[in-house]
Curated annotation (Swiss-Prot):
Name of the molecule in the record: 7-carboxy-7-deazaguanine synthase
Subunit structure: Homodimer.
Organism of origin: Agrobacterium fabrum (strain C58 / ATCC 33970) (Agrobacterium tumefaciens (strain C58))
Catalytic activity: 6-carboxy-5,6,7,8-tetrahydropterin + H(+) = 7-carboxy-7-deazaguanine + NH4(+)
UniProt keyword list: 4Fe-4S, Iron, Iron-sulfur, Lyase, Magnesium, Metal-binding, Queuosine biosynthesis, S-adenosyl-L-methionine
Gene encoding the protein: queE
Keyword 4Fe-4S (UniProt): yes
Function: Catalyzes the complex heterocyclic radical-mediated conversion of 6-carboxy-5,6,7,8-tetrahydropterin (CPH4) to 7-carboxy-7-deazaguanine (CDG), a step common to the biosynthetic pathways of all 7-deazapurine-containing compounds.
Length: 251
């Protein structure tokens, strides 16, 4: 696509946006600690029981999701980053619902990198253009069922383009067993285990209390589990932003 065509697409393509914020650090997964601007889209095809971003998921909050052109989104990213290239995290909800290919192309043309996390339920051809793709299938505690064919479709769509990682949120033994099975199914993917936050915020209260002690107890349990099982390829990482700021939004 020529630069002129990209500019036209940027003006004409509309994305539902829940919030854009940063720069801050990526709080979880393989890019943890990396300076990042977040573009959070609105809408999701899942309803996980412990979702911590219901304001970007529940259709009750649809009126707060702002339809924005790619050009308008990009101007916000540029303003937040001061025009200095960094990583842009595309999140949600499920960002795979939205038409993000034009945004990725525009940003990469200016030296920015793009990462996306999704549950792996919807494959898009523009996955191949990402720099990082984190596939985070939802374990039994979420109340959702995993469509492994759709997950494999996401891997196929990504091809050899982005660095791909597997991340699973863990609350209990059933989730742990699910993560081990998923890792065995896709042994070529680096795997990250994240202790679940059992005190996620209500969508209208980002100051809700977090049981940090409970989350850290779960993390210690996870460390002990992988050590006992000799699962030495797994990495256990917390949600760093939760440890720093609790359930506060926009950080």
């Amino acid at each position: 696509m020529t630069e002129a065509a990209r500019n036209i697409a940027a003006r004409e393509t509309t994305v539902r946006i829940s919030e854009i914020f940063g720069p801050t650090i990526q709080g979880e997964g393989p890019l943890i600690g990396l300076p990042t601007v977040f573009v959070r889209t609105g809408g999701c095809d899942y309803r996980c029981s412990w979702c911590d971003t219901l304001h970007a998921v529940d259709s009750e909050y649809r009126d707060t999701w702002k339809p924005m052109s790619v050009e308008a989104i990009w101007q916000e990213v540029l303003g937040l980053s001061g025009g200095m290239p960094l990583t842009v995290s595309l999140s949600g909800g499920n960002p795979a619902i939205q038409p993000l290919g034009t945004l990725i192309a525009k940003g990469q043309g200016e030296g920015y990198r793009f990462a996306l996390e999704t549950q792996g339920s919807i494959a898009k051809d523009w996955f191949a253009d990402l720099d990082h793709l984190v596939l985070s299938p939802k374990p039994p505690s979420s109340g959702m069922e995993t469509d492994w064919q759709a997950f494999e479709d996401c891997l196929a769509a990504a091809g050899d383009g982005p660095q791909v990682a597997l991340k699973v949120v863990i609350f209990d033994d059933a989730d742990y067993a699910y993560a081990k099975a998923a890792s065995a199914r896709f042994p070529h993917l680096p795997v990250y285990l994240q202790p679940g936050n059992h005190t996620p915020p209500p969508p209208d209260d980002d100051d809700a209390r977090v049981d940090i002690d409970g989350v850290m107890d779960r993390m210690l349990w996870l460390v002990e589990k992988i050590s006992e099982d000799r699962w030495f390829s797994a990495r256990v990482l917390p949600q760093l932003h939760v440890l720093l700021w609790g359930n506060k939004r926009g950080v």
